[in-house]
């Protein structure tokens, strides 16, 4: 069991397939595993763990970048960047073979059969079917998450001057999940979004629009998702941007004027906290829970052991006795002499410990690196527990 955490993501990454790339002359437009390995390695060094490969009008680079990402611990989503009458859109799919196939089906629907999405020089052509809202709706029908890249750019952004005449209708349609602040930092929509969005709160983010080695990872966004990012996790982040989207603190000087944008210096917790609970034996036998550094909610129906789990934590951490005698009896009944629990925590200095105690009533043991410390548990951890009806 895991918890939601902030992942640093760049959702607009181009490969040498892009005619305007500046990675160097040695790379081919065709998928190259060596380039993919170098790309994800550089992102990994920059702390980025989520990518979307967004080449114009093509998806063939996705498999090699995804493979390199799997080896480097980076989640890679298949995606497209397309131009609809000059307005650019991004469409992202689930990071699976099915997601890749859905993207290919969507791409095939954008031009008549036999018509190439590239011109004679290899440059991507604009979509020949539909307006911005219609193409965005088609992408959603193909299970894509649609974003507006460099949305304030003068010649290609949704809110760029003269780019999309009905940008307000598109912005309020619900078809586009997020809007990239990049393009024109002085754009009015960034400080006065109501003129375009009405009562809708825009989900702002920033991406790299990466085409060169220099600056990789500098323009990226923290997105709060589960420990294994999914397309649904991305969708939920954009739906609840006020709690799940943050720009890196280093970008504050550039984008602090954007209404609604929040910043984060470091997602890693610095306060004392419980980190894991492991129980062997008894009612909760085999339970292993990774605790979030903030609020944790234990959810379940009646009789599933929620209150008992709280009482086990109280008991193992030697945090006193419950006021309710039934609570103590419940713990003894479900956490008997053959059961043992370990509660792991990090103190204010960042040192990691484990408290281990069996259900036989013996004293709790404080361990560090698997070795007993000989110290009383309360010397290193103190918790306040309010059980049921307390």
PLM regions and their residue ranges:
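Charged catalytic cores and adjacent phosphate/nucleic-acid-binding surfaces used
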Residues: 1-37, 41-42, 46-48, 60-108, ...
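Active-site beta-strand/loop signature of hydrolases that rely on acidic residues for catalysis
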Residues: 49-57
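Internal, conserved structured core segments that host functional sites
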Residues: 129-148
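Short beta-alpha junctions and helix-cap segments that line functional grooves
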Residues: 191, 324-331, 369-372
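Nucleotide-state sensing region of NTPase/ATPase domains
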Residues: 332-387
């Amino acid at each position: 069991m895991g918890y939601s955490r902030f992942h640093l993501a760049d959702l607009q990454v181009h490969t040498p397939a892009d005619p305007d790339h500046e990675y160097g002359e040695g790379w081919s437009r065709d998928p190259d595993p060596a380039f993919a390995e170098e790309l994800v390695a550089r992102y990994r060094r920059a702390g980025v763990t989520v990518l979307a490969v967004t080449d114009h009008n093509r998806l063939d680079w996705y498999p090699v970048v995804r493979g390199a990402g799997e080896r480097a611990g980076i989640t890679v989503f298949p995606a497209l960047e397309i131009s609809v009458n000059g307005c650019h859109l991004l469409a992202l799919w689930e990071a699976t073979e099915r997601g890749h196939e859905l993207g290919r089906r969507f791409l095939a629907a954008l031009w008549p059969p036999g018509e190439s999405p590239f011109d004679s020089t290899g440059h991507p052509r604009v979509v020949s079917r539909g307006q911005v809202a219609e193409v965005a709706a088609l992408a959603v029908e193909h299970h894509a998450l649609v974003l507006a890249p460099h949305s304030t750019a003068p010649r290609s952004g949704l809110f760029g001057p003269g780019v999309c005449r009905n940008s307000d209708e598109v912005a309020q349609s619900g078809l586009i999940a997020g809007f990239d602040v990049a393009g024109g930092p002085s754009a009015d929509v960034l400080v006065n979004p109501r003129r375009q969005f009405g009562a809708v709160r825009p989900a702002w983010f920033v991406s790299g629009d990466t085409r060169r080695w220099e600056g990789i990872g500098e323009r990226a966004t923290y997105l709060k998702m589960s420990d294994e990012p999914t397309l649904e996790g991305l969708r939920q982040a954009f739906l609840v941007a006020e709690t799940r989207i943050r720009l890196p603190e280093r970008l504050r000087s550039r984008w602090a004027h954007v209404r609604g944008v929040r910043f984060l210096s470091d997602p890693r917790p610095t306060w004392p906290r419980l980190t894991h609970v492991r129980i062997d034996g008894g009612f909760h036998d085999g339970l292993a829970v990774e605790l979030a550094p903030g609020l944790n909610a234990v959810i379940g129906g009646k009789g599933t052991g929620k209150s008992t789990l709280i009482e086990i934590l109280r008991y193992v951490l030697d945090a006193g006795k419950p006021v309710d005698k039934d609570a103590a009896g419940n713990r003894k009944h479900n956490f008997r002499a053959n059961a043992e629990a370990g509660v792991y925590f990090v103190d204010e200095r960042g040192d990691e410990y484990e408290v281990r105690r069996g259900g036989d009533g013996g004293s709790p043991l404080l361990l560090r690196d698997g070795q007993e410390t000989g110290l009383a548990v309360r010397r290193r951890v103190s918790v306040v527990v309010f059980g049921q009806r307390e």
